[in-house]
């Protein structure tokens, strides 16, 4: 392991060594290592839901077992990539939710109660208002702790994580963008948001440094800029990784415990989002 960027937490490693190099408390390691080899979730076990608003955003949802009494649970929101756009409320779960359902596996094997939702967008971009609509709807249906809402996504979904956090940085407890990009401008509001960023150094779709070019930049540049203004994002870069590194990333044993340890100080009132005057981005494609 070696530092790639100046900062407190960067790593580059051989993907085959991921599990062996993690040092975790025994009970966490046992549960997560067991989960790494077993898929506990069938697509049909995730409820099909549509938001009860004008956007009518489709999403899939599951609550893992283990809730005690009136306990409020963390919410993990997964944003898919652009090739899974549509309205069938199914495509976003392809490839085991592009690996994101490994987090649900880990929760089930570790008896960790949480709510996982995987919305679907009709755009090749994730307008933040669609993300907010899903969170707002899920808060009304499931016993969610509004101080523990986490965003993760891959490819254009990773970019959607960046853009949603920029829009409402105070509302999400952490972000885990993978193979994503965003504009270099406007990073200051998210410098204090806990982040764990993943990217492949050989990504030939969304360049790790330059994104798609122009105003858009990739994960390495984003992390560097955040650290320059006082942010402390974690950053994992796979030296031989191409664009689809997310199965490796979601298999990282420390990821779920790290994520669930994050909280916002004061919960947002999602019933008031989007804020007055917010204009969602529509018709914007990030395809080259």
What are these regions (language model features)?
Residues 94-107, 130-134, 178-188, 217-222:
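Alpha-helical scaffolding within the catalytic cores
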């Amino acid at each position: 392991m070696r530092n790639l960027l100046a900062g407190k937490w960067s790593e580059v490693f051989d993907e085959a060594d991921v599990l062996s190099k993690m040092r975790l408390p025994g009970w966490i390691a046992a549960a997560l290592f067991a989960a790494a080899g077993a898929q506990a979730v069938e697509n049909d076990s995730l409820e099909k839901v549509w938001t009860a608003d004008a956007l009518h955003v489709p999403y899939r949802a599951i609550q893992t077992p283990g809730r005690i009494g009136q306990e409020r649970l963390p919410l993990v929101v997964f944003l898919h990539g652009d090739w899974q756009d549509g309205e069938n409320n199914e495509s976003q779960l392809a490839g085991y939710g592009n690996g994101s359902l490994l987090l649900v596996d880990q929760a089930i094997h570790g008896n960790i109660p949480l709510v996982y939702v995987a919305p679907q967008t009709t755009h090749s971009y994730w307008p933040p208002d669609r993300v907010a609509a899903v969170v707002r709807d899920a808060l009304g249906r499931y016993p969610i702790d509004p101080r523990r809402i986490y965003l993760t996504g891959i490819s254009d979904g990773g970019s959607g994580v960046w853009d949603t956090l920029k829009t409402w940085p105070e509302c999400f407890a952490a972000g885990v963008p993978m193979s994503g990009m965003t504009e270099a401008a406007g990073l200051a509001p998210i410098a204090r948001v806990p982040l764990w960023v993943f990217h492949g150094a050989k990504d030939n779709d969304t360049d790790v440094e330059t994104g798609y070019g122009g105003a858009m930049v990739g994960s390495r540049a984003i992390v560097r800029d955040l650290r320059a203004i006082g942010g402390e994002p974690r950053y994992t870069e796979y030296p031989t990784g191409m664009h689809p590194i997310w199965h490796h990333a979601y298999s990282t044993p420390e990821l779920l415990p790290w994520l669930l340890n994050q909280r916002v100080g004061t919960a947002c009132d999602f019933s008031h989002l989007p804020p007055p005057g917010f204009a969602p981005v529509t018709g914007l494609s990030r395809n080259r």
